[in-house]
């Protein structure tokens, strides 16, 4: 059975409402149809053991080149949604399957229908409020264009790009689900207090003292490879993911569940 690690982070913000002080969130990313073959039962048990109040899914449930496994992954999310509010935003694999229907048919629509039926809250360039004791936080889901995942000729992200998709952030504490961590500075400038990201699979191979070796655009030793990052008043928690796709290996890089404990202060 493949090992799964749980990384726990304490995140502090003066903006966090008092009712949310100590709230715990579990974050999953990059399950990729479970091609890598972790025990989803074990993962479910680990999440339940953490007793989160919310579950965040930061994209890439499926793998664009693979057509099996989505039912198993959706089944996991249904079990989670029966216990907790589960919030999902697309990763680049969902976006590609959605755009290229001539190649992938109705896979995207089937996935979205299955997630809705499972009770998952889908936030693709939208937001929902989560309320507690008369106070609330905002949870946003960002789906950026495929051009921002290109290996060559990737454009820079204009200052108003994010607000053009999801508007300006509302007053109060805001969580942004944004699959691609490479634009963390833009997410922070937009006004996200906490960002959940994935995409880079921890750099595929991790070396002692050096971190991840390779990201999806074939950058060696990328700055954003996993863990906690700060940019002014924003924090990003970058999960190392739970699966693989094109390169079906993870060396010194076990699949990762992320647990975030939010604190006012």
Language-model-detected regions and their locations in the chain:
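Beta-strand-turn-beta hairpins that frame and shape the catalytic cleft
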Residues: 13-26, 120, 127-139, 169-171, ...
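Solvent-exposed loop/turn segments at secondary-structure junctions
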Residues: 33, 61-64, 92-96, 128-130, ...
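Conserved beta-sheet core of the metallophosphoesterase superfamily
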Residues: 180-258
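Active-site neighborhood of phospho(di)ester-bond hydrolases with catalytic His/Asp-centered motifs
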Residues: 27-29, 54-60, 85-92, 123-126, ...
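Core catalytic region of metal-dependent phosphoesterases/phosphodiesterases
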Residues: 39-130
């Amino acid at each position: 059975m493949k090992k799964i690690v749980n990384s726990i982070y304490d995140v502090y913000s003066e903006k966090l409402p008092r009712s949310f002080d100590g709230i715990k969130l579990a974050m999953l990313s990059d399950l990729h149809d479970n091609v890598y073959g972790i025990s989803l039962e074990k993962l479910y048990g680990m999440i339940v053991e953490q007793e989160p109040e919310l579950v965040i899914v930061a994209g890439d449930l499926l793998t664009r080149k693979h057509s099996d496994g989505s039912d198993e992954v959706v089944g996991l999310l249904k079990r989670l949604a029966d216990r907790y509010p589960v919030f999902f935003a697309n990763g680049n694999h969902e976006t590609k399957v959605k755009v290229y229907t001539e190649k992938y048919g109705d896979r995207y629509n089937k996935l979205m229908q299955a997630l809705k039926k499972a009770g998952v809250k889908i936030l693709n360039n939208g937001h929902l409020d989560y309320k507690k004791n008369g106070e609330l936080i905002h949870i946003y889901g960002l789906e950026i264009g495929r051009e921002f995942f290109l290996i060559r000729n990737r454009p820079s992200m204009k200052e108003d790009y994010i607000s053009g998709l999801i508007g300006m952030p509302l007053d109060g504490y805001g969580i942004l689900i944004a699959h691609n961590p490479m634009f963390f500075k833009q997410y922070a400038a937009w006004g996200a207090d906490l960002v959940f990201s994935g995409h880079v699979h921890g750099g595929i191979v991790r070396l002692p003292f050096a971190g991840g070796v390779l990201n999806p655009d074939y950058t060696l030793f990328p700055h954003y490879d996993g863990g906690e990052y700060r940019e002014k008043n924003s924090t990003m928690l970058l999960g190392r993911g739970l699966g693989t796709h094109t390169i079906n290996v993870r060396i010194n890089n076990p699949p990762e569940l992320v647990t975030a404990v939010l604190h006012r202060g």
